[in-house]
Amino acid sequence: MNAQETLDTLKSLGTEQNRKIYRRHGAGEDVYGVSFAHLKDLKKKIKIDHDLAVALWESGNHDARMLAGMIADPKRLDARTLDTWVKGLRNYVETDALGGLAAKSPHARETMARWIASDEEWTASAGWRVLAQVAMDDDALPDEYFERFLSTIERDIDESQNRVRHEMNNALIAIGIRNPALQEKAVAAAARIGKVEVDHGETGCKTPDAAGYIRKTVERKK
């Protein structure tokens, strides 16, 4: 399928109920309301098609961007494209999708550093999302790499923007479940931070207690 055919397919699969739900989560007006199950079916059909993914993301449609995140080839994402895309983020769902892609790109760590330093809420959120993914995926990085981010999170989370606080908390959790040494340090940092307040708007989403979440996740892994 080309980009227009894919957009037409997405439009045909959308529902008004999903559009209402997605808009509560920040999707805006350009949304078809395609279920995650239908997106997964399309992903299976298309597999990896990076050129199509680029066209879909740049269409600006929310559902198209979700599918783009599933069919893109992260190895073909250059830093310029990532920096262009991050400027167009409008909600946390797109932020999570782009952060997950960026974490698997050849430019993950340098992109993460630029984004974390940004004053833009969605850009900084995406940077912390990259860090969380790197913490979960890259077993080769030493503990020292992540310890400095624990210090940054503890120092800055209270004064950070709303969605940035949520992603920093998620990064804290991801670091804490890497190994016992980082678990101890992350749980201690979470205790000093205390409850992380995040406004999730008209949704049922919540920001988890980092220390409790880390402990439960580690226990399940045993």
Give residue ranges: language-model regions:
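Alpha-helical scaffold domains
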Residues: 1-222
